[in-house]
Amino acid sequence: MAKVLTLLVLRLLMNLLLIGWISLWIIKPTTIWIQSWRQAEDTARHTFFGYYGLNFAVFSFPPIALSIVGLIYLSLLPQHHHPTRGGRGAAITVSRPAIINSFIGIVSCFEILALLLFLLFLAWNFYARVSNDFKKLMPVKTMNLNLWQLKYYRVATRFGLLAEACLSLLLFPVLRGLSMFRLLNIEFAASVKYHVWFGTGLIFFSLVHGGSTLFIWTITHHIEEEIWKWQRTGRVYVAGLISLVTGLLMWITSLPQIRRKNFEVFYYTHHLYIVFLVAFLFHAGDRHFYWVLPGMFLFGLDKILRIVQSRSESCILSANLFSCKAIELVLPKDPMLNYAPSSFIFLNIPLVSRFQWHPFSIISSSSVDKHSLSIMMKCEGDWTNSVYNKIEEAANCENKINNIIVRVEGPYGPASVDFLRYDNLFLVAGGIGITPFLSILKELASKNRLKSPKRVQLVFAVRTFQDLNMLLPIASIIFNPIYNLNLKLKVFVTQEKKPSNGTTTLQEFLAQSQVQSIHLGTDEDYSRFPIRGPESFRWLATLVLITVLTFLGFLIGLSHFFIPSEHKNHSGVMKLAASGAMKTAKEKVPSWVPDLIIIVSYVIAISVGGFAATILQRRRKHKEAPRMSKEVVIKPEERNFTELKPIPITEEHEIHIGERPKLEEIMSEFEKNLRGWSSVGVLVCGPESVKEAVASMCRQWPQCFGVEDLRRSRMKMNLNFHSLNFNL
């Protein structure tokens, strides 16, 4: 009872922090807030914390506090807890696809609502600022502008604030270990889309802001004078130009046409974000930067934690080479490491490339495989083909390689086993997109039947019969009735007319499939190189708190040292200020001094966080790991794919040759076999064409919006769409 009450209090606190931060953004452009905030800053200047401490506490700390409270909340939840299964009252769903477009992807109703609210906020912010500017137009001292030029110049300036709003949210969606999206059960693979949206908005508003400013400077013949100016106080224009150019370069190289063909160009160019953020700080000033700081702060700490984790080495224990040029890699893991189905890891193999990291879905279940973790990759690119060749060489070489060292980051995945909330599951996979469903089916096979979905329909589309070998890791689950999954599998082979081995059923084909199993690791490696995974949520919350206190301490300390303090001689200051003979302490020093203080404080704080993470990592590594052997990690009955014996089954799975799946017909057939009304989770993973086809089906399918609709209709189900695709 006490734990439930604690969770409720934490949830309330998170809502208050989020509402408070959003409210600050809404009231920020109002005249009342501007006047009140100036008075608050004047008062804070005479205190120990100063105006910088006040800005950090009000604008930067709420999102960071939300992250800390969220991590504590997640630490108190049962590990990978199962959400309550939805009933009739939960008929309405916000995951229903509303827009399906090849350029912007698949957008749900909830995402459209959130996007409209954000655009409404931007419109309000822009209107409030511009209307206030037009009421009190002040001429620019260095330029002689007429009325329309002055108005246009003010409008251009305010577009910069819209870019600032996008930048403040830009880095939150790409957090991994410290991601707040997992509180909404939104996976990293899905949240990357929001990063793209915010980045596009940032570049658009920045281009309007910078281009319009350059236009005014050009027509007034001040461009050469203004563009290279590094002002002692105020905005540094050359820094703004640097920020705009680097941001535009990152955006161009992230376009799908460039990113997919030249991933390395995209990857390395994106590291210019450091230059972009530093230039933005010098251009906008410290006061504006406090709004952007939360995302940057959490992203920097998250990056350091990932670097610390990725420095730990693991190894490949065994590999299974399938005839379709797919590889299953088995890695050792700590038995205490648990992860949700559909989780993924980032993998680096120094033997192939020291710098390239690639994401792969985990195909094993931590409920079943306590000592190992498995992934599968399809060899379709240079890096994956190199991995395949290296492992093949290791198998054929007389002097066999004892182990292949790898580095792993993750696992990352949903905070809860979300698919268990549905009464039934409809899974659609295309090619290598089957991988997240392998872990889901293994998880379902290990669960109590009462907690699992009643029926599971898997639609698997491949180009050739050889691609069906990717089903081998779950062959025993598919054909063995003891698992009682009530699984129906429909396989579609689109580019071949008959199998080369003359088989007629899926079971016969898989039984005759050739798999080359290679054991690389020694018995010692099973205990030397286990994957331990990210740190616990509670420890992460503590680390964030330590880091933020370090930042605040150095921010205040360095500011007191380098910026003249006013609170020591308050009476003298008031006399000088009344006579107009004194400028504020902020105006005494160049504007880049507070900016440098923020940078130095940030670097020190992140370094302290990285040092603490390194110490904990070493402590975990030096703890005595439980001894494991090859027999424990790789069970013969699970890994010997070539001895798949025919098992009598009650329902034969279907193979359709030379045709594509007709999803509407399959869904209608699936609905006929349901008893009573139920919620259906529709999960898809595969190429964009497959994802869009499934989304179109869900959008066109009739939907009920309440109990009365259900009574009047003859519908048996509501569809809830989820895409498991990972796209960088």
From Swiss-Prot:
Main EC class the enzyme belongs to: oxidoreductase
One of the GO BP terms on file: monoatomic ion transport
Binding site residues for NAD(+): G410, P411, Y412, G413
Required cofactor names: FAD
Annotated TM spans: 56-74, 104-127, 194-217, 269-293, 316-336, 537-559, 595-616
Tissue: Expressed in shoots. Detected in roots, pedicels, flowers, siliques and leaf veins.
GO cellular component, one term: mitochondrion
Protein name: Ferric reduction oxidase 8, mitochondrial
